[in-house]
């Protein structure tokens, strides 16, 4: 068992399975609409240096595991962020900046989401404040600072950094771009999720193979939700 902070311990013992799983396409697209997903692609595909990231076939791993095909979507090639979360935060920044001019962007992050938000603000000439917990490495902080953001380190864990972000954003009238939805905050997270759906749009054009499983890392679940929405939109099987 590894301790990550002063009061919480985590232990990984087994894979978890959702016994109530049901892929309801209409239900999914009622949450993240087909229009929002389409708008995300139409916007991002016009960005400078946009191109599909590679879909690599892992031949050796296929053979060793005796599977038909394993593909790897290499998001490290997305723009110049070297991050698997380049799409969502930057797209949300662009959308909200069209409704409000000369805004200051803020966000709490453990690394990758904040990098996208910072880059999204930089490309539009906006100020950006990124909040991180004391556990975020200096390397990640430097990657965020490369895109011109002010990084505020907060004592405690991610929740503490998020609470501080909310408090100071309200006080200073900053605009929060977060990938976590709450009761009164869902539009911006939906935009963020829609940005990630582009990965599935690209995959649908990069292979004709029947995709049976998709594996991805997930924290708060924004990217995972965006991928599921992309599957509902672009995979018809």
Regions found by a protein language model. Give the residues of each.
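PLP-dependent amino-acid enzyme catalytic core
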Residues: 1-237
């Amino acid at each position: 068992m590894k301790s990550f902070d002063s009061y919480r311990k985590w232990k990984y013992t087994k894979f978890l399975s959702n016994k109530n799983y049901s892929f309801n396409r209409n239900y999914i697209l009622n949450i993240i609409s087909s229009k929002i997903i389409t708008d995300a692609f139409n916007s991002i595909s016009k960005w400078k240096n946009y191109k599909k990231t590679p879909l690599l076939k892992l031949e050796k791993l296929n053979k060793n595991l005796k599977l038909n095909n394993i593909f790897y979507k290499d998001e490290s090639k997305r723009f110049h962020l070297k991050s698997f979360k380049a799409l969502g935060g930057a797209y949300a920044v662009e959308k909200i900046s069209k409704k409000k001019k000369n805004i200051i962007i803020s966000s709490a992050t453990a690394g990758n989401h904040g990098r996208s938000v910072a880059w999204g603000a930089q490309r539009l000439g906006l100020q950006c404040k990124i909040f991180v917990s004391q556990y975020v490495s200096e390397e990640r902080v430097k990657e965020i600072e490369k895109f011109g953001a002010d990084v505020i380190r907060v004592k405690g864990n991610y929740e503490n950094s998020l609470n501080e972000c909310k408090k100071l954003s309200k006080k200073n009238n900053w605009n929060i771009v977060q990938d976590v939805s709450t009761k009164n905050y869902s539009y911006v997270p939906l935009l963020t999720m829609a940005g990630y759906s582009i990965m599935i749009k690209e995959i649908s054009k990069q292979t004709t193979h029947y995709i049976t499983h998709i594996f991805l890392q997930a924290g708060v679940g924004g990217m995972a939700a965006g991928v599921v929405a992309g599957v509902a939109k672009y995979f018809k099987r």
